[in-house]
Structures are given as C-alpha cells and as structure tokens.
C-alpha cells in the first residue's frame, strides 16, 4: 500500500508543461503509464483542440470551464477515449480539475 500524501503540505505546484502560461499542476500519480494530476487553470485559460494516446478523465473540483458551448461546473465529469479530439477549452475565472490519464495500451 502506498503512503497517504497530504497534497497541500507535501506537494508543490509546478508549471504545467504543454499547457497555456500560468497553468499549474500537482502530480498525484505517475506510474506504469498512468498519470493523475490536479490542474489549476488560471483565469482566461484557453486550450486548443488536441488528443492523447490514452483515455482522459476530467473532474471539476472548483470553478468552471467551457467546452463545446457547455459549462462544466464543480462536480462535472468528462471522459475522452484514446485518440479522441477534444477542445478548445476556456475558463473565464479559472478552475481546479482532477485529470486522470489511463495507462497506454498499444492495441487501442
């Protein structure tokens, strides 16, 4: 069993590479091809159309963002399959999102 991590005391916010300037992350898990992060979107956040080689799940913890004309508020959930295009995203006031990428499976 892994040790419990106190996210706000033991993990620092880092610049989120490949995201717009001012976006930060806390990496909760990065093992065996799977990754989980807390993503802090700044006010005015915008990310264009993109895809990933693995599936992605998003759960809004705080704030909101807009995707394809629908606003995802606190408690909202999204799932995208591997190679599925998604975006653009926009957050007027910023958001805190739990993002989970599943392990890469070459046969997907």
Task: Tell me the role of every PLM-derived stretch.
Residues 1-33:
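A short, N-terminal "cap"/entry segment at the start of jelly-roll beta-barrel domains
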Residues 22, 29-51, 66, 81-85:
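Conserved short histidine dyad/triad with adjacent acidic residue
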Residues 53-67, 74:
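Glycine- and acidic-residue-biased ligand/ion/polar-headgroup-sensing regions
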Residues 82-107:
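Ligand-binding loop in jelly-roll beta-barrel domains
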């Amino acid at each position: 069993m892994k040790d419990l991590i106190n996210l706000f005391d033991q993990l620092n916010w880092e610049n989120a590479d490949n995201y717009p300037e001012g976006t930060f992350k806390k990496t909760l898990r990065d093992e065996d091809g799977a990754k989980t992060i807390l993503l802090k979107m700044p006010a005015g956040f915008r990310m264009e159309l993109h895809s990933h080689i693995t599936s992605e799940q998003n759960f809004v913890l705080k704030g909101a963002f807009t995707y394809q004309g629908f606003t995802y508020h606190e408690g909202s959930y999204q799932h995208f399959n591997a190679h599925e295009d998604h975006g653009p995203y926009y957050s007027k006031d910023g958001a805190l999102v739990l993002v989970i990428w599943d392990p890469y499976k070459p046969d997907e």
